[in-house]
Amino acid sequence: DYSDNALNAFRLWCERKYGTIENLNKAWGTTFWGQEMNGFHEVLIPRFMGADSMVNPGQKLDFERFGNDMLLDFYKAERDAIAEICPDKPFTTNFMVSTDQCCMDYADWAEEVDFVSNDHYFHEGESHIDELFCSDALMDSLALGKPWYVMEHSTSAVQWKPLNARKRKGETVRDSIAHVAMGADAINFFQWRASAFG
């Protein structure tokens, strides 16, 4: 998020990562367009300022890494709290590995779950099956030879994409078989029909 708490946590994350503001300035290339900072208190969260604006790519990448680390820490805290009550239960969480959504460092996440699991949704167009194979190959590599699951796989259209195309006849079966052929040990469906809201 973009709250003061997130800003302060991002500044601390940057300080731990770089040690000195000079190291951060060098890594982000802040000499360009006079972006140099004099202290970590000057670090800001990257913000989109309009169609012609530019966000420092090093700053943006580090903010993505920061977000990954914060979410992973939150997952581990939840997992550990539940494990105290249910120590014999396996733990996982839904990855979102696809060619248009993979902004998390799932190699780090894979070490923290008992088995990896993915949400995979239909990509309309000719490249859909190629995208499915690419996503599943990445999941299979993250699983390191252990079972992995497709936690969410739609039967047809969803309600949350800008354009919500329906699957054609046979595509749900084809995609399910393709996931299994690529190594998935379980296929779960969500949702049977697109929600009316949300």
Features from the language model and the residues they span:
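Hydrophobic targeting/anchoring helices
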Residues: 92-198
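Polysaccharide-binding and catalytic clefts of secreted carbohydrate-active enzymes
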Residues: 1-115, 122, 126-132
